[in-house]
Amino acid sequence: MESIEQSIIPGLPDDLALRCIAKLSHGYHGVLECVSRGWRDLVRGADYSCYKARNGWSGSWLFVLTERSKNQWVAYDPEADRWHPLPRTRAVQDGWHHSGFACVCVSNCLLVIGGCYAPSVSSFPHQKPVVTKDVMRFDPFKKQWKMVASMRTPRTHFACTSVSGKVYVAGGRNLTHSRGIPSAEVYDPVADRWEELPAMPRPQMDCSGLSYRGCFHVLSDQVGFAEQNSSEVFNPRDMTWSTVEDVWPFSRAMQFAVQVMKNDRVYTIVDWGESLIKTRDTDEGEWYNVGSVPSVVLPNHPRELEAFGYGFAALRNELYVIGGKVLKWEESGAGRFDIVRLPVVRVCNPLDRPLNWRETKPMCIPAGGSIIGCVSLEESSPP
């Protein structure tokens, strides 16, 4: 029997031992819990999570939701090179699918915002989809989901990003605005409160959001076409919108196509024919090629295959290409193929030339295939 008074680490004061264990990232928690019952109770306890939260030791996370995962998110720890499933959220009922939501990290938490709940045909054949304004928050310290303040307007397929510690949303659609929503809102995670912003000059639907140079950019589903290169830009400093003529060369088929890294370095994937990574000259606004995403090689298959439906994320100065699917054609030439869902994760440093890709640990069960949501969280200290 272990004594309650037993030291956390024999030979070390408990406050120093707690600090040592708390500095280990979340990917090691499963191993820590196997050391002893005392360590298991420590890692799962409220004092431990509060201690990490006070010091801002969230660690770095890559959150991913894939198809056929029954709405269960998984997370990657780059320090431990480990994936692990998150607790299930109770907001999504069994037999329903969540899509069209936005996911963003702010104040060391993951927010899953809005979207549409649609039933599977077999489970609820007469039930219509429901557009929601709900917001779920995952606390990486407590490892718990919680409902927080809802948006003022239900919306799906909308623009969302974080700027200076607040979350901005705009556009999208719902049952009463099928051609686009002009309204915008901002969320303060400290006050847990949403506030209305001035409406956009024109409604936007099926749009994406980007934080760039301190402003909230709303990119429409038509970006990438020569005649549709304008975007709506909100400046939080003077609370005004402006329409900017600019060039964003990605395809809307890529849901997570733009990543902004340190020093406003912008990267995108252009998935027309082949998957090219481009970066933007911050002064001139021109785009140029950095390299390509490597093809997929399957065991016992002679040809290299192009993936689709993958996610794209930036974490700790590296770019991640996550999951996706490939079509594995039969060699008989009969035109038949299998759809292979990929758990593979590929990483590169975009400053290396040529790009040097490596594979991390593949995603854990139940993840794999097309990416529905992905976002990264990097540790930041409290003010």
UniProtKB/Swiss-Prot annotation:
The keyword Repeat applies. It holds the Pfam family Kelch_1. Kelch repeats lie at residues 50-103, 109-165, 166-214, 216-263, 318-377. Residues 7-54 form the F-box domain. Keywords: Kelch repeat, Repeat. InterPro entries: F-box_dom, Kelch-typ_b-propeller, Kelch_1. This is F-box/kelch-repeat protein At1g16250. It comes from Arabidopsis thaliana.
